[in-house]
């Protein structure tokens, strides 16, 4: 039997053939987070790292609670904006005209392309499989370690 799409994409990223059930370590092409990037930025600082490793591989999109329905949401948005600026993250989609639904932006802006691998903090990252994009869902407390 031939390889699955996931086996092909992960094997390409790992530089060696992989099979179902095998544990492999690969570097994702992109990591995506949305409004929950505020807790990510807090955890990032707690682990004692001053700069993100590859800011151009990060995509932050504010799309879940916009406009901010509560003071807490507004505070989270401010924390995300501050973190993005501090870290030099250029792939930031705020609630302005550049913003939108995270999954739509990932596809329309060319982050979700066939054969690439992405780790996202949203439970619907599986939708990228529709465009042959390998996706892995990570809890926001894990995404800061990727």
Predicted regions and their residues:
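Short active-site loop/helix that positions an aromatic residue
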Residues: 128-133
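Conserved small/polar residues in nucleotide/adenosyl-binding loops
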Residues: 134-141
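Hydrophobic alpha-helical segments, chiefly the membrane-spanning helices
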Residues: 145-146
């Amino acid at each position: 039997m031939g390889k699955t799409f996931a086996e092909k994409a992960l094997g390409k990223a790992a530089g060696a053939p992989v099979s179902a059930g095998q544990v492999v370590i690969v570097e994702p092409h992109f990591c995506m987070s949305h409004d929950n990037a505020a807790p990510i930025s807090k955890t990032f600082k707690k682990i004692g790292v001053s700069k993100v490793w590859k800011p151009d591989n990060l995509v932050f999109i504010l799309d879940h609670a916009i406009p901010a329905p509560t003071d807490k949401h507004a505070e989270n948005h401010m924390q995300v904006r501050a973190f993005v600026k501090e870290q030099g993250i250029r792939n930031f989609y705020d609630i302005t005209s550049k913003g939108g639904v995270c999954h739509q932006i990932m596809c329309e802006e060319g982050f979700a392309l066939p054969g690439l691998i992405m780790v996202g903090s949203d439970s619907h990252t599986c939708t990228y499989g529709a465009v042959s994009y390998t996706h892995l869902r990570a809890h926001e407390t894990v995404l800061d370690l990727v």
